[in-house]
Amino acid sequence: MNKPSSQPRAIYYVVALQIWEYFSFYGMRALLILYLTNQLKYDDNHAYALFSAYCSLVYVTPILGGYLADKVLGNRMAVMLGAFLMAVGHLVLGASEIAPTFLYLSLAIIVCGYGLFKSNISCLLGELYKPEDPRRDGGFSLLYAAGNIGSIVAPIACGYVQEEYSWAMGFALAAIGMIAGLIIFLCGNRHFAHTTGVNKAALHARTFVLPNWCWLLVLLVAAPLLITVLFWKEWSVYALIVATVIGLAVLTKIYRQAQTQKQRKELGLIVVLTFFSMLFWAFAQQGGSSISLYIDRFVNRTILGYEVPTAMFQSVNAFAVMLCGVVLAWLIKESMGGNRTVRIWGKFALGLGLMSAGFCILTVSARLSAAYGHSSMPLMILGLAVMGFAELFIDPVAMSQITRIEIPGVTGVLTGIYMLLSGAIANYLAGVIADQTSQSAFDASGAINYAINAYIDVFDQITWGALACVALVLLIWLYQSLKFRNRPLAVES
């Protein structure tokens, strides 16, 4: 039987857009916690609260974004609209020094754009393959790894521009990246003719007198304003609770929709994977908050007289993802038909194990800081690289399973639910964890002593927590191996 030897041409436009979206999103993210603490002079508690609220709501909106794509917009249009909104949000963020309202409004616009973009970019990629196409896993790993080109360059470029010019210029550069990606994507429109387009019948149908396109416009205006209020009043946790309840209700409905035992098993597998992904990302998302402030305060960042901007360290994680992801995609492709196929539970155990190893290295770094006043940069880079490598064994596996499910018309919503739990809930938990390192309640001397010990405790606890997750995953793997010893447990099954 002939096997396709190359990826669909359309994937390269999807990958290009993903690269620039990563550049835009992670360029801003690398600056945000530092902007809040160093420029706006927020205390650690306030900065962590706003940062985690933003990162949580970013992953709530994909549920609505997935629904709109499934029912009305189609994946391609949803992705383009989301990219446009994110570009606008980054531009508005540059004006946030003028008034706090601009800060909240800009974050709200980015949240809405991300909701339309993030879940549907994966679904758009899934449309390029048939369900059993052996190139699918390689395509998802390629998307995940190649997208990190943007997140490698972004912290370096945005961090440098911010350091040399201004915070506003750093955020503006992130916006330019998103606009560039959108233009490239539009140039490849002809390669997406076979994908799902806008549902014109649904768009022109009337609901409560008005056509649905009018309600869509109202939603695009009202949603950013509502989210702005949530940031301003610090009500985001309530929105998170409501979204979680709705998400679980939708998940229950999808389970009832399943018509075969195979579909129910596939859905059950996705639920378990999502749970472990949630724990993984609660640990990993320390990179943008507590780890970033730890580097800023306790790591010697000087090379040949030049002090490396803290934001640039965000590139280390992404570089590890890109480099190792290309190799992993090749290994999966080469082993697709044989006994060397990487098992799904083995991937998750390895990912969580690497996360534990990464935080173990950070614990050593923090102990050195406590002993000598600062830690070395190479040790920090090693820890971040190990944590970046770990990501390749989590999200690509889970996303590939979601897009393969045979229940019709639910991939967008399932992706949104996955983003809700592994993104929104995980980021909320990450904020709770990061807050344990806050030093705002102490004077300058006491804060330093308290903070370094707090970092040691938090990093050490995450090390052991991730190891406990590895043990649970290995137990599930062993159970599945014994139960289905005569059937392969390959990722594509």
From Swiss-Prot:
Its main location: membrane. It holds the Pfam family PTR2. The chain crosses the membrane at residues 14-34, 49-69, 91-111, 138-158, 167-187, 212-232, 235-255, 267-287, 312-332, 344-364, 379-399, 413-433, 458-478. It is found in: Cell inner membrane. It comes from the Bacteria. InterPro entries: AA/pep_transptr_DtpD, Dipep/tripep_permease, MFS_dom, MFS_trans_sf, MFS_Transporters, POT_fam, PTR2_symporter_CS. Gene3D superfamilies: MFS general substrate transporter like domains. GO terms for biological process: protein transport. GO terms for molecular function: dipeptide transmembrane transporter activity; peptide:proton symporter activity. Keywords: Cell inner membrane, Cell membrane, Membrane, Peptide transport, Protein transport, Transmembrane, Transmembrane helix, Transport. GO terms for cellular component: plasma membrane. It is a multi-pass membrane protein. Probable proton-dependent permease that transports dipeptides. Belongs to the major facilitator superfamily. Proton-dependent oligopeptide transporter (POT/PTR) (TC 2.A.17) family. DtpD subfamily. NCBIfam families: PRK15462.1, yjdL_sub1_fam. PANTHER family: PROTON-DEPENDENT OLIGOPEPTIDE FAMILY TRANSPORT PROTEIN, RESISTANCE PROTEIN MDTM, PUTATIVE-RELATED-RELATED. This is Dipeptide permease D.
